[in-house]
Structure formats: C-alpha cells, structure tokens
Curated annotation (Swiss-Prot):
Lipoprotein as UniProt keyword: no
Full protein name: Macro domain-containing protein
UniProt keyword DNA repair present: no
Species this protein is from: Acinetobacter sp. (strain ED45-25)
Keyword annotations: Plasmid
Family per similarity comment: Belongs to the MacroD-type family.
Length: 183
C-alpha cells in the first residue's frame, strides 16, 4: 500500500531518496526554499544545475529536472518549476499540477522509493496556499498508484499555515489504496 505523510519540518534535513526543490526556470538558485537548498546542497549540485542551464536553457514552468542532492540527506534533487501567481487566469493551476506530476514522474523514473515535496509556489511566487494544497494533494493522490517505484510521499510543510491547510485536506481523505499519515 502506498503511503502519504504530512510532516512539519525542514525539508533539507529530512532523509528520503529524492527531495523536490521549488526551483526557478534557470535552475541556478533563487529565493526562499530554492536559495536554502542551493546553499546546503553545495557545489556538485550547483555544477549540475549550471550544466542543465547551459545545455537546456534551464527548465520550463511546470517541468522538472533531476540532479544529485549534494550535501543534503537524499540521493537526488528534483527541481520542479512552479508558476508565479498572477491572477489565476494565466494557466497557473494547470502549471502547478504539471510541476507536481512531472516531479513525481521523475521520482519514479529514478526509482526513488521515498520522495519529499515542499509547498511549491506558495512562497515568493505567491500562489494562494489553500488552492496550492488542493492541487498538490489531488495531483499526487491521483498519480501515485500508477507508479511502481515510489512507495511513500512526504508533504513537508515548514510554515504553520501550510501545515494546517494540508492537515485539514488530508484528514478528510479516505482512499483504500493510500495510507494517509499525519505527524
């Protein structure tokens, strides 16, 4: 049975096979969590991001790329590029859904058994937290059963507001194929 966990913690200190980074299009580091991950992961991960930027021009919004996790407690980093919130009329919900689904696809592709997700786009990109949580949870729960390799997903919320929103949504889910665990 697949498992989905909700934990309030620092995603950079949580050991899993793959950590999803809320990245920007350049993959070269930005603000918020992206800045923290780049700082803590170190030079090897940064070199891979520079290479991806040079070879592919970065990563389009809604897509994801994989690098080493460097000094973080994971084997891989999956850099998912979420959208900036403008007004909800510029395809932002679909792009956020795509960011989560492509990150999960990449996790399965690299045979990650466990993967942690942050609250993509809710920080400096300004996506409304309630709407973002609904999209994140809905996307992961609908796609997770399709994948053979990913056994556990961890939603890691640092801020109280996001944690409480995720907790409220996940507490009301009853899926016979997925065990929901709230810490």
């Amino acid at each position: 049975m697949k498992k989905v966990h909700l934990i309030q913690a620092d995603i950079t200190a949580f050991a899993v096979h793959a950590i999803v980074n809320s990245a920007n299009k350049s993959l070269l580091g930005g603000g918020g969590l992206d800045y923290v991950i780049h700082k803590k992961a170190g030079p090897l991960m940064k070199e891979e991001c520079v290479r991806l930027n040079q070879e592919k021009g970065g990563c389009p919004t809604g897509q994801a790329e994989v690098t080493t996790a460097g000094n973080l407690p994971a084997k891989y980093l999956i850099h998912a590029v979420g959208p900036r919130w403008l007004d909800g009329e510029h395809n932002e919900p679909q792009l956020l859904c795509d960011a989560y689904s492509n990150a999960l696809f990449k996790a399965n592709e690299i045979h990650a058994l466990t993967v942690s997700f942050p609250c993509i786009s809710t920080g400096v990109y300004g996506f409304p937290p309630q709407k973002a949580a609904e999209i994140a949870i809905g996307t992961i729960l609908s796609m997770l059963p399709q994948y053979d390799h990913v056994a556990e997903v961890f939603f890691i919320c640092r801020e109280d507001e996001n944690y409480l929103i995720y907790k409220n949504i996940l507490s009301n889910i009853d899926d016979p194929n997925i065990q929901i665990l709230i810490s």
